[in-house]
Design a protein with these regions (language model features):
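Conserved hydrolase catalytic core segment
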Residues: 1-35
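A catalytic-pocket lid/entrance helix-loop region that shapes and gates access to the active site
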Residues: 37-62
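Short aromatic-enriched loop/helix-cap "lid" or pocket-rim segments at secondary-structure transitions
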Residues: 35-40, 111-112, 139-141
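A short, basic/aromatic alpha-helical/loop segment that forms part
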Residues: 33, 106-107, 135-138
Length: 169
């Protein structure tokens, strides 16, 4: 499971470790560069220049907070990153996927989660959360928990059914 950039990282893990990855869940994950993402990053870059804002990142990244911020913003805003996509990895994913995305996500349009579905041959469930922005787990934690639980329960039932069928062979 991964959120935002972590969703991309989780996707790469699912692509590389197909035999070991049983499921992939992403939330608010980018699958490509688009202007909505870039404008959100430009805005965040300006916000983090304000007094006290970098301290929010220091809570998670300590003294490397500025480096983390610069690595994120400068990579995404660079000309070299302009045509980046996850497509080559998404095409390799075989495990079931749950793709969660806020309808009003200010960093990524609905094209982001739809690209996951379009580019991967894996069985997938796209869950668009209505009236939700970039932080579904904070905005509607109960709904996120419910949809993830339901997905994992179905996966468990399928895995047990598949395991039982294999034992009978």
């Amino acid at each position: 499971m991964g959120r935002r950039v972590g969703g991309g990282m989780a996707s790469c893990c699912a692509a590389y470790y197909q035999e070991r990855c049983k499921a992939l869940i992403t939330m608010s994950a980018q699958s490509m560069v688009e202007e909505l993402t870039l404008s959100g990053i430009r805005e965040a870059k300006e916000i983090f220049k304000q007094d006290g804002q970098l301290d929010r990142l220091k809570k998670y990244h300590g003294e490397k907070a500025q480096w983390v911020l610069d690595a994120w913003t400068e990579t995404w805003l660079s000309e070299a990153f302009k045509h980046w996509t996850l497509d080559e990895y998404l095409q390799k994913i075989q495990c079931p996927m749950l793709i969660i995305h806020g309808e009003l996500d200010e960093y990524g349009s609905l094209n982001q989660p739809q690209q996951y579905i379009k580019s991967s041959p894996a069985p997938s469930q796209l869950y668009i959360m209505e009236n939700t922005h970039h932080m579904p787990h904070k905005e509607k934690p109960e709904e996120v928990l419910a949809v993830v639980t339901q997905f994992l329960e179905k996966l468990t039932d399928f895995t047990q059914l598949n395991h039982t069928a294999n034992e009978q062979v």
